[in-house]
């Protein structure tokens, strides 16, 4: 007999944008995961400058360090059904599999290593090229209070103005070519064994890649030449992939 969903919605902490709700690749993967598992949740939107205080308030662990200080990031979930607060995407995914074993698995037995390998290959090939193309425009979709925080922290991280990070001319063409090669190799994998990374059912790696594509779409804008380029890579296979993931999007504004 299928068990009923947990009585209390999980609280999912996310970063808002000024137009579309969810945009971050890091939080998108957990939004996908919660919807895939059919777990009720509600979103609590938190602006960038308030993330650290919110994490400390609810007892979320830091996910790294910055300037020798604890770094607090989203996604974070707070599960009133178990009393657990979990931060960091993969840790949240494993927690959801363990806490709700009667829901579809994000890490089916024996697949975690392969999932990691597929995503690592994609990011190793395309990551260095995509970051300077996609990170700077994020500042344009954030709410007012988050814009200066994002600009200050990222410019310190990258050592220059956001606008100066965006490659131009031949450098831009080269960056796009690196991205194209990486994502077309991924699209070929889907064609050979899909519709998802490991076959007929999505897994956590699919939600990670789907989150990246959502990030591109929202941040670059669907009318941008960059998104138009992405949309035709692999004969449109990436757009079909996003469409295949659509049942697990839910409402990105809610």
Report each predicted region and the residues it spans.
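Amphipathic alpha-helical segments that form well-ordered structural scaffolds
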Residues: 33-36, 91, 95, 178-189, ...
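Short, well-structured alpha-helical interface segments that form or flank functional binding sites
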Residues: 25, 29, 87, 91, ...
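GST-like fold's C-terminal all-alpha helical module
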Residues: 118-233
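C-terminal helix/juxtamembrane-tail motif
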Residues: 243-254
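Short, hydrophobic secondary-structure boundary micro-motifs
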Residues: 104-108, 197-199, 225, 254
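Intrinsically disordered, low-complexity polar regions and short flexible loop motifs
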Residues: 234-242
């Amino acid at each position: 007999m299928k068990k009923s969903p947990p009585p209390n919605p999980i609280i999912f902490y996310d970063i808002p944008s000024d137009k579309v709700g969810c945009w971050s690749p890091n939080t998108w993967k957990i939004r996908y995961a919660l919807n895939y598992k059919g777990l009720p949740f509600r979103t609590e939107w938190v602006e960038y400058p308030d993330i650290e205080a919110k994490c400390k308030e609810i007892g979320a662990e830091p996910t790294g360090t910055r300037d020798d200080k604890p770094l607090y990031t989203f996604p974070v979930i707070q599960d009133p059904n178990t009393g657990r607060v979990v931060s960091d995407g993969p840790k949240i995914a494993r927690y959801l599999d363990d806490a709700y074993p009667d829901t579809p698995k994000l890490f089916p037995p024996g697949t975690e290593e392969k999932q990691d390998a597929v995503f690592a290959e994609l990011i190793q090939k395309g990551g260095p090229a995509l970051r300077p193309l996609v990170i700077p425009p994020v500042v344009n979709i954030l709410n007012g209070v988050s814009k200066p925080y994002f600009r200050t922290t990222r410019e310190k991280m990258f050592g220059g103005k956001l606008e100066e990070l965006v490659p131009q001319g031949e450098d831009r063409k080269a960056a796009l070519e690196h991205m194209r090669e990486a994502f077309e190799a991924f699209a070929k994998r889907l064609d050979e064994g899909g519709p998802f990374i490991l076959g007929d059912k999505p897994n956590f790696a699919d939600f990670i890649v789907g989150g990246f594509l959502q990030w591109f779409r929202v941040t670059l804008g669907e009318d941008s030449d960059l998104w138009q380029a992405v949309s035709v890579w692999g004969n449109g296979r990436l757009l079909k992939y996003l469409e295949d993931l659509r049942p697990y999007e839910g409402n990105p504004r809610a």
